[in-house]
Amino acid sequence: GCFALTEPGAGSDVLAASTKAELNEEKTHYILNGQKIYITNGSWADVIVVFAMVKNKYTAFIVEKDFEGYVIGSEEKKLGIKGSSTATLFFENCKVPVENVLGEVGQGGPIAFNVLYPGRYKLGVTTCAGAKYLIKGALDFAFEREQFSRSISNFDMVKNKFANMVAKSWESDSVNYMTTGAIDQAISKLDKNDDNFYAGVQKIIEDHSIESSIAKVLGSETLAYTVDEGVQVMGGAGFIEDYPMAGAYRDERINRIFEGTNEINRMIIGGYVLKKSIL
């Protein structure tokens, strides 16, 4: 499946969507018109969650790939994450059964954000893990590489680079463990047999949205710093595709953009702190 949110005129401002959905005369189908861009898994997905305006009410729909009027554009040629599909999706009088409204008309906002919140948290975890993996790769190279008749790992400048990389990874890791623990503890207090269990889980995710934003910003920027310094430690070898840093350098960049840019996440964090006046 895929999550079709972004539009040419609605990136960070997702609620400014111009994709429209109008109920047909028979009231059996919504007719969708518009386009979504930069959609991950767009070329492969059998099921697509699409957001559109129903009389200015932001609404989520479940679209299947064989629906009339659904058109998949060409693959984007990206800087990195080349193994992932990224495509533009077109909705040209796309017929969507009324029962395929996800939730209710007008509930698209909470649905969209409750996908973004855990996505940010998971991105914080995976980028931190990537940073630690690259630190190990840079360490292996530093121990093996010799200049001036000794391992470059003995040079103070190189030691300083590793000290900074490790400190940043620990900072990111700490936020991830704290957030994971808080969410896990809150969920453990819910009754799994309660009909409202999943609504409770959703509420917990919403309540930890700020931690998720912090984890995303820290993790993605830790990975960015680490891969940049990793290239520097490896010197010319870091610029060669046969070594791990080159691919990581390209793949890393998107992490500061998707799931909400780091600038947007900083606005969310800052706004929350100023509103609540607490840490």
Residue ranges of model-derived segments:
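Short Gly/Pro-enriched turn/cap motifs at secondary-structure boundaries
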Residues: 9-12, 38-41, 53, 78-85
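A short, Trp-centered hydrophobic/proline-enriched beta-strand micro-motif
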Residues: 1-6
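Short, solvent-exposed loop/turn segments at the edges of secondary structure
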Residues: 14-16, 43-45, 55-56, 84-86, ...
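Alpha-helical interface subdomain recognition
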Residues: 88-90, 115-279
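A structural signal for short hydrophobic beta-strand segments in well-ordered beta-sheet cores
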Residues: 19-23
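A short core secondary-structure module
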Residues: 28-72
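Long, acidic (Asp/Glu-rich), low-complexity accessory segments flanking structured domains
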Residues: 92-111
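Flexible, small-/acidic-enriched active-site or ligand-binding loops
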Residues: 16, 68-97
